[in-house]
């Protein structure tokens, strides 16, 4: 048994804890003089005035101290433990020594830090809890022995706190120089609860007395020693034992008799406490002095002798200094900080305590050799049986009957159960054989111990017999000298008769009794050994029989391959399922993306239609357009010429078709819902077309979501938007229903929304059945129009607004002719839209399509006449009215339904020079009443739709309504206001003197 381990230098760790100021100190008028600056620095200020302050500068005489870690009154017990002691536990388990001690004057919280309370346990309890937790975590690989001793040094006398009846104990030094306490009680335990109970028992035995400075003053130094021995569970001929010791010391505080007001016994206790602390301070001073190699006097106090290894030997040491922040304890705090600062310079030489223990080498060597031979024999047998099995398999490969018999043999459930039972028997035989070998080993160890004890007792008896014969010889010599003159016969008789009987000592009698018991035990051990050897031979024979039986009943390599292939098939099935799930997720994501692209394409088509219609109105009326809007329109034209978005759409359609043709599971697209319309008959008529076009039509665009708009409404349009009117009911003007089903249910409105829609048309061909159904739906529309024609014949023409421009009549005529030549309904998708239908939009057909007066007045900056109203003649207006009236009478017999884009949730927006991006996207606003006070910023914003006007209603002075330009009374107001609705035929006069009909 010897110590081993490499040593290394370790710096002594010093921590400082400043306790909170007490109520008694505040009542005495004390002030705070100790402050924590950061995690390591503490400043102590001198409360007294400087007697050498000649210049009366009153400079602060403060001094800063730097430690490894500093705590103020806000620190908790857990924080102190984590920063100081927790790191020592791993080293103690590994075989290193460690020491933690609290230092400082009386009443500064040393006992509170070390012991704590039930609610806030101190370092003792937390360290022991973590120590046993760490032992439990590694107990599977290591064996541990934990022992504990608890003592106190009271008046320079050592007392055992676990067993106070032992009295005062003495310090001794063993052969290695380690200080030991003779007769101390060491309690071995591996249970945390038990060691906590012992700790509480020792604390109750500790000496505590009240003083004027501290009501619970500790009158002794308490030392708790925990020893941990660690050894590996794997047995070997050489075993390594690691022994670590942990010292936790609660020192008594230094005190002044003037402060504590001690008398008698308390004063003697204080003197002894101060003496031991003075010796500790001298040791700290000597150890911290780097320049001198002087002698360190540890013998001045028993405390310093116990702390010899902790201060300058083999230990990792942590010193927790405690001070009071009150000005009344300035001197004690300064001395404590001084000694703590010096202790930082102390270095200890730490090494691991390793004990190498040699056991019975010859015995363990023979056992290991037997086990290795057994392993080699089993390996050879397995190899031989494997070779015979392969050779037999090659010989019988062509024998079909043998193969069938073998398959039937291994396919039955009974054979499988027999194989499992055979394997279990073999495993149990090996386990029993190992147990018997282990018991034989234990018997051998016990027999050797009995033999050693027998030899020791025999030596004791032999020594006594030798002593007895020596005494008898000496007595005979003495008798021979005394009776030299007597007769020889008398001498012989005297010596034989008078020789005293020598009493046998008790240890010899005990040895004789022990020898008898040991002889009996040896006989029992011999019998048990013979029985175990016989059992071992039987188990070996049983194992050999099982080893010979198992190869004949075990399956071939093919069965093992089948089992592995089945496992592989299962793994591949799992992987295949995962791949299918990933494919489904990817398919769903692609289809959602395709739906989003289709929705954006519909939105783009609607925006193209709106942009082109508004541009046609601007060109027809020569309206002034801001430069910003012109630039944006040029960008738009370039994008149309490039056709990048159409190409992207075509690629998306090709990708979607390729995805549909794949073998992955299909995702059914959501059916498009038909937007409710006020015209119930129109909805019923178009429902058949919508059912056939459901797979190709897109879902309706939400007019409320701003996220999909190309142009988002700005803040300036919200007021007009809030005053807008929802989707109007059908209004009849001259027996005309001016509302139809929404355009999103029509395939033609989706494809023909842009000039380049022929490419999209070619991508979605219509079958003969679909064309026939569309034609049937169109005939239904014409039947409905014929029914309404009879009602229109009996209704007189309404007084509509008077025309104001030449373009109104021209556009009316062109629209009427274009509508006559073009069949309505979804058949319009067969050819590109007519430029006349797309761009020839005037105020009269717009008003007739919605049944309302124009909702917007066109204005520009300034109060002069508008560009498209210049040169207007009243005579031309009268002639135009007469010609229109004649046409209306001539073509009254012809009547058809006016269809228009469904206007759900209309919006009102204003356009300024820098507000082109705020235009509403796909629903143009239509208001019921004119807004006379609107001042526009250079662009006409009108509702756009494919308008069909009946020629029978286009004659007369009230058929068309001009774009009214109301006056701007304020001259500078840009805010849209709603005025009272004026009756038909009234006129307003602007500042330019021109008459405008409302």
From Swiss-Prot:
Biased composition regions of type Polar residues, renumbered to the chain: 662-676, 684-697, 746-761, 836-852
User: Sorted alphabetically, which InterPro entries does this protein's record hold?
Assistant: Kinesin-like_fam (IPR027640), Kinesin_motor_CS (IPR019821), Kinesin_motor_dom (IPR001752), Kinesin_motor_dom_sf (IPR036961), P-loop_NTPase (IPR027417)
Ranges for domain Kinesin motor come to 11-346
Record field: compositional bias (Basic and acidic residues): 482-494, 989-998
Question: What's a single GO MF annotation on this record?
Answer: microtubule motor activity
Q: Does the keyword ATP-binding apply?
A: yes
Q: Which Gene3D superfamilies does the UniProt record give?
A: Kinesin motor domain (3.40.850.10)
Biological process GO annotation list? axonemal microtubule depolymerization; microtubule-based movement; plus-end specific microtubule depolymerization
Supply one GO CC term from the record.
axoneme
Record-listed ATP binding positions: 104-111
Domain of life of the native organism = Eukaryota
Q: Which PROSITE patterns match?
A: KINESIN_MOTOR_1, KINESIN_MOTOR_2
| Major site of localization recorded for this protein | cytoplasm
Keywords recorded for this protein, A-Z: ATP-binding, Cell projection, Cilium, Coiled coil, Cytoplasm, Cytoskeleton, Microtubule, Motor protein, Nucleotide-binding
What start-end ranges are recorded for coiled-coil regions in this protein? 360-391, 424-452, 507-552
Q: What ranges does the record give for the region Disordered, renumbered to this chain?
A: 482-503, 662-706, 746-765, 794-911, 948-998
Cellular compartment(s): Cytoplasm, Cytoskeleton; Cell projection, Cilium
Name the protein family.
Belongs to the TRAFAC class myosin-kinesin ATPase superfamily. Kinesin family.
Role of this protein = Plus end-directed microtubule-dependent motor protein that regulates the length of motile cilia by mediating depolymerization of microtubules at ciliary tips.
Name-wise, this protein is: Kinesin-like protein KIF19
Query: Which organism was this protein described from?
Result: Homo sapiens (Human)
Top-down, what is the taxonomic lineage of the species of origin?
A: Eukaryota, Metazoa, Chordata, Craniata, Vertebrata
